C-alpha cells in the first residue's frame, strides 16, 4: 500500500537525522539501506514509536511511496550514486523524482539530470549543509535540477529547513547541477572562513600573546558584532574547552589539517572559468602545507626566521586586537565577493539565472557559514540584482574603506613576525589588484609575444592585435610552437 510521502536511502547519521526531522514535521518516511539490518535497527531504536516505515528492498520501498514517488539518496558521492540510480529507475514511472542529497560534483548532477530527463524521471541535486545537528533540527537546503520537481518537494523541504527570521533557508536554486554547484561554493567559502579565523587565532596567540581564556573572551566579543557567526561561536567554545588535565586541548592537537576535496572542487571551477577565487585557493593550500608536518619541523630548525619580539611590533595590544578583527572582516568580504563572482559566472555559463539574494538567505541558517554578515549580502543583492561585485555595494564599500588601514597594519605585522597569513594577505592582494586601473599584465603580454608571438592588444586601438619582432633579426617564433 502506498503510504509514504518520501523515501530516504542511506542510514548513516545524516540520513537518520533527516528522516527524524521529516517525521517531526508530519511526513511519513520510508527508510532504506543496502544493509537491511540497519533498517531494522533504526526502526527498533531511533525511529521507535514514530510513523517511520522501512523497506528491505528497492522494489518494496517504491511500492510504499505515494505518487509522484520521491526518493532521496544520502549516500557516498560518485559511482555509488550512479549505481543506486540504476537500481531505482526500473521501479519508477514517468514523473517520479530522484533526489541526490550527497556531496556530489555539479558536473555529475548536470549529467544525471540530462540522462534521467530522457527517461521521464525528474532529477534534483540538493546541497545539504549543517552537519548532523542541522539534518536533525533544520539544515540549509539548496535544491536544483528539474524545476517541475519543485512543487512536489517544496512543502517537505521548506518545512524541515532551518529558519532565519521566519523564512526557510531553502529555495529553488536553478536547473541541472546548480544546487550542487551552490553547495560546492558554500563549502569553498567555509574553507576560507575557517582559514581566516585560524589566522586570527594565530595572531592573537603569537603576536598579541594571549592565553586561551583571553582569546576565547576576544572571540566572544567579536561574536556580538559584525563578525557574529557560527564558526566564531564554536571557535570561542573550542578555546574554552579543557581536557581531563584541565588544560586547553588545541595545543595538543596535531597541526595537520585534513580535507574531503570540496574546497579543491571550488578552486578547479574557478580555474576553469578563469576567475581569481584566490582566498579559497590559499585556504586549500594552507591545509596542504599543514600536512607537511615532519618537513616543517625540520625546516623550523634549519632555516632562519625573523628575530623580532612581538612587543616591538605590537605596541598597543588592545588596538591591535581591534585591527585583527577589522582585517578579518575585510578579508571575509573579499572571500564572499570572490565566491559570488564564481556563482555569477556559472549562472551565465549554464543559463541558471541564480538568485544571489535567495542564496545568501539559504546560508543564513542551518549551515556552517551561517552569520549576520549574510543578511548584509542578501540586502545588497535585493537592492541591486545586477550587482557585479559585492565590493561595489555601498554597504561593503564603506565597510572595507573603514577596515583597510587596519588590514594593512595586520598583514605587515604578520610579515615582520614571520606569522603566515596566506588568506589575509591574498585577500588584500586581490583587493589591491581589483582596485588598480593598471596592472603589470601589459608586461606579461609583451613577454608572451616575445617568446611565442601571441600578439597583444593596443590601448589606443581596442580590438587590434599586433605582433612585434622584438629582436629585429628575424627569428620569429609562432604561437603554435609555444603556448603559454
From Swiss-Prot:
GO terms under biological process: D-gluconate metabolic process; defense response to Gram-negative bacterium; negative regulation of gene expression; pentose-phosphate shunt, oxidative branch
The UniProt annotation places substrate binding at: 103, 129-131, 186-187, 191, 260, 287, 448, 454
Function in brief: Catalyzes the oxidative decarboxylation of 6-phosphogluconate to ribulose 5-phosphate and CO(2), with concomitant reduction of NADP to NADPH.
EC identifiers of the protein: 1.1.1.44
Superkingdom per UniProt = Eukaryota
**To which protein family does this belong?**
Belongs to the 6-phosphogluconate dehydrogenase family.
From which source organism is this entry?
Caenorhabditis elegans
**Catalytic activity reported:** 6-phospho-D-gluconate + NADP(+) = D-ribulose 5-phosphate + CO2 + NADPH
Keywords from the named record: Gluconate utilization, NADP, Oxidoreductase, Pentose shunt
Which residues hold NADP(+)?
10-15, 33-35, 75-77, 103
Q: In which pathway does it act?
A: Carbohydrate degradation; pentose phosphate pathway; D-ribulose 5-phosphate from D-glucose 6-phosphate (oxidative stage): step 3/3
* Keyword Oxidoreductase found: yes
Subunit details: Homodimer.
Query: How is this protein named in the record?
Result: 6-phosphogluconate dehydrogenase, decarboxylating
Active site, renumbered: 183 (proton acceptor), 190 (proton donor)
Q: Which GO terms describe its cellular component?
A: cytosol
Q: What class of enzyme is it?
A: oxidoreductase
A GO molecular-function descriptor: NADP binding
Amino acid at each position: 500500500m502506498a503510504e509514504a510521502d518520501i523515501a530516504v536511502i542511506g542510514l548513516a547519521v545524516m540520513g537518520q537525522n533527516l528522516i527524524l526531522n521529516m517525521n517531526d514535521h508530519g511526513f511519513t518516511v520510508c527508510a532504506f539501506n543496502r544493509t537491511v539490518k540497519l533498517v531494522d535497527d533504526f526502526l527498533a531504536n531511533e525511529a521507535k514509536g514514530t510513523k517511520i516505515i522501512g523497506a528491505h528492498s528497492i522494489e518494496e520501498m517504491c511500492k510504499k511511496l505515494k505518487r509522484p514517488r520521491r526518493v532521496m539518496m544520502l549516500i557516498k558521492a560518485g559511482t555509488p550514486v550512479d549505481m543506486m540510480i540504476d537500481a531505482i529507475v526500473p521501479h519508477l514511472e514517468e514523473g517520479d523524482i530522484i533526489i541526490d542529497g550527497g556531496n556530489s560534483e555539479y558536473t555529475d548532477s548536470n549529467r544525471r539530470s540530462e540522462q534521467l530527463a530522457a527517461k521521464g524521471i525528474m532529477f534534483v541535486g540538493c546541497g545539504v549543509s549543517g552537519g548532523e545537528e542541522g539534518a536533525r533540527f533544520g539544515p540549509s537546503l539548496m535544491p536544483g535540477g528539474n524545476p517541475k520537481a519543485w512543487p512536489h518537494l517544496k512543502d517537505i523541504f521548506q518545512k524541515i529547513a532551518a529558519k532565519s527570521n521566519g523564512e526557510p533557508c531553502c529555495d529553488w536554486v536553478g536547473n541541472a547541477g546548480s544546487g550542487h554547484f551552490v553547495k560546492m561554493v558554500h563549502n569553498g567559502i567555509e574553507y576560507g572562513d575557517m582559514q581566516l579565523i585560524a589566522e586570527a587565532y594565530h595572531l592573537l596567540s603569537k603576536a598579541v600573546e594571549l592565553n586561551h581564556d583571553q582569546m576565547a573572551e576576544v572571540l566572544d566579543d567579536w561574536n556580538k558584532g559584525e563578525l557574529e557567526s557560527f564558526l566564531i561561536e564554536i571557535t570561542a567554545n573550542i578555546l574554552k574547552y579543557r581536557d581531563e588535565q584541565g588544560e586547553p586541548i588545541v595545543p595538543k592537537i596535531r597541526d595537520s589539517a585534513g580535507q574531503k576535496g570540496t574546497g579543491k572542487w571550488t578552486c578547479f571551477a574557478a580555474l576553469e572559468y578563469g576567475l581569481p577565487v584566490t582566498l579559497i585557493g590559499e585556504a586549500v593550500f594552507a591545509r596542504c602545507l599543514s600536512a607537511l608536518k615532519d618537513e616543517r619541523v625540520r625546516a623550523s630548525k634549519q632555516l632562519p626566521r625573523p628575530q623580532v619580539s612581538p612587543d616591538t611590533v605590537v605596541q598597543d595590544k588592545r588596538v591591535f586586537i581591534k585591527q585583527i578583527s577589522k582585517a578579518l572582516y575585510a578579508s571575509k568580504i573579499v572571500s564572499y565577493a570572490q565566491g559570488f563572482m564564481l556563482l555569477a559566472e556559472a549562472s551565465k555559463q549554464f543559463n541558471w539565472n541564480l538568485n544571489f539574494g535567495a542564496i545568501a538567505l539559504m546560508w543564513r541558517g542551518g549551515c556552517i557559514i551561517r552569520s549576520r554578515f549574510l543578511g548584509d549580502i542578501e540586502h545588497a543583492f535585493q537592492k541591486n540584482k545586477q550587482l557585479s561585485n559585492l565590493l561595489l555595494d555601498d554597504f561593503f564599500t564603506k565597510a572595507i574603506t573603514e577596515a583597510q588601514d587596519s588590514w594593512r597594519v595586520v598583514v605587515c605585522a604578520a610579515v615582520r613576525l614571520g606569522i603566515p597569513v596566506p588568506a589575509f594577505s591574498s585577500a588584500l592582494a586581490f583587493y589591491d589588484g581589483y582596485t588598480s586601473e593598471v596592472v603589470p599584465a601589459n608586461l606579461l603580454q609583451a613577454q608572451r609575444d616575445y617568446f611565442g608571438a601571441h600578439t597583444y592588444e593596443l590601448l589606443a586601438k581596442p580590438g587590434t592585435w599586433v605582433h612585434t619582432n622584438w629582436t629585429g633579426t628575424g627569428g620569429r617564433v609562432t604561437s603554435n610552437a609555444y603556448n603559454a
